[in-house]
Regions:
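Generic structural signal for hydrophobic core residues of well-folded globular domains
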Residues: 12, 39-42, 77, 81-86
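Alpha-helical structural motif
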Residues: 4, 24, 31, 35, ...
Length: 156
């Protein structure tokens, strides 16, 4: 995991997290993993192993790219989902504004949405080419991609 449960303390107080999850650490881990998967769905053209690592592999692969803004986005998303579950002494509107700033949508573009649309280009590695496929995926994920049909000769 890119974000540990103890790192959510920058977004929510520990006693608030314990009140929401009823002292169940599995609930916090579940929300963090869901937030990471949510971010991965936006960042499909980048090398997700370099950004997030792989905790399902043996041995575990650590992320090679360190980006604090990506970590902050995951923390905001996980915190927002925790607060939506139950919000003891937490202003939900403040978390909604943070969520819109970090994620966004078509009407209110946020950081992740702008990366997906190509408006922001972070200094992250693109997904490597898969040698088992005929197409070069690393070239298609670049900012500019073009192709054409084969030239054909017409005879009458």
């Amino acid at each position: 995991m890119l974000v540990l449960p103890s790192e959510l303390n920058t977004e929510l107080y520990p006693e608030v997290i314990e009140a929401i999850t009823r002292s169940n650490p599995d609930e916090t881990i579940s929300q963090i993993k869901a937030a990471e998967d949510f971010c991965k769905s936006y960042l499909f053209k980048y090398d997700l192993i370099a950004l997030f690592g792989n905790d399902k592999a043996d041995p575990v692969v650590s992320p090679t790219v360190k980006d604090e803004n990506l970590k902050k986005t995951i923390k905001v998303i996980a915190s927002y989902w925790l607060v939506r579950k139950a919000s003891p002494n937490v202003n939900l509107d403040l978390f909604r504004e943070d969520f819109e700033l970090m994620v966004g949508n078509k009407e209110i573009p946020g950081w992740l949405y702008d990366i997906k649309e190509g408006n922001i280009s972070p200094d992250w590695p693109y997904k490597p080419d898969n040698p088992d496929t005929p197409e070069d995926e690393s070239a298609t994920n670049d900012g500019v991609h073009w192709s054409s049909n084969q030239k054909r000769t017409q005879r009458f």
